[in-house]
Amino acid sequence: MAQVKSLAQSLYPCSSQRLEHQMKLQILKNSSVTCNDGTPAGYYIKESRGSRRWLVFLEGGWYCFSKHTCDSRYESMRRLMSSSNWPPTRTGTGILSPQPEENPHWWNANTVFVPYCSSDVWSGSTPKTDQRGHQGALN
């Protein structure tokens, strides 16, 4: 693994500087972009100065489609419906890892991790409420 790290650092000019390993939370100020429970949405970012490559990762997490399924989801998977317990930083793993041994192709890219908290399969939402009282995605 030391050979991989040495090779990776020799190939990229930005590798000689100290790279930030933590992705920092950025909460969105646009009040119309929220999680299911009304908390603000956001993203984590790690900039790699000198790199022109970007990796944007949208977290998955399934969906809910009615008041009943959303209430059940909130009880069992609250982290996928709220930003209230998001930590201020995250360490990337796998393809988001800043370690060349773990991620030899993208370790020094600028990375963005977008947590999933809207239960809409990344399709957006509507301000209208359906006949059953459910506000959600236009599917």
From Swiss-Prot:
It comes from the Eukaryota. It holds the Pfam family PAE. GO terms for biological process: negative regulation of Wnt signaling pathway; protein depalmitoleylation. One of its GO terms (molecular function) is palmitoleyl hydrolase activity. Belongs to the pectinacetylesterase family. Notum subfamily. PANTHER family: NOTUM-RELATED, PALMITOLEOYL-PROTEIN CARBOXYLESTERASE NOTUM. Probable inactive palmitoleoyl-protein carboxylesterase. This is Inactive palmitoleoyl-protein carboxylesterase notum1b. It comes from Danio rerio (Zebrafish). The lineage of its organism: Eukaryota, Metazoa, Chordata, Craniata, Vertebrata.
